[in-house]
């Protein structure tokens, strides 16, 4: 436990941010998994619809600093390629 008051406050802030980031990353994984399942099933319409929502979530996570912008770009590119293969 920190002795300095400002560090105690930072620890609280960091813990809140960690939990928030964990939640965002979990929802990202769920969105990507849903897209991949739709793509694997060959449902092009549903996959295209899920791609849009997944891309929005990836962009938002990148803009908030939860994931790196290049990671978001790489995931978006891979998902688009998967959709185009259908």
UniProtKB/Swiss-Prot annotation:
Gene3D superfamilies: Ribosomal protein S20. One of its GO terms (biological process) is translation. Disulfide bonds: none annotated. The keyword Nucleotide-binding does not apply. Residues 1-25 are annotated as: Disordered. Belongs to the bacterial ribosomal protein bS20 family. HAMAP family: Ribosomal_bS20. Binds directly to 16S ribosomal RNA. This is Small ribosomal subunit protein bS20. It comes from Mycolicibacterium paratuberculosis (strain ATCC BAA-968 / K-10) (Mycobacterium paratuberculosis).
């Amino acid at each position: 436990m920190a002795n300095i008051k400002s560090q105690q406050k930072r620890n609280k802030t960091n813990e809140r941010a960690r939990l928030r980031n964990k939640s965002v990353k979990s929802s990202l994984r769920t969105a990507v998994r849903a897209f991949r399942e739709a793509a694997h099933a060959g449902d092009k319409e549903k996959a295209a619809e899920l791609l849009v929502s997944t891309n929005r979530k990836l962009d938002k996570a990148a803009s908030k600093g939860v994931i790196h912008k290049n990671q978001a770009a790489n995931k978006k590119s891979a998902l688009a390629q998967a959709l185009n293969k259908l």
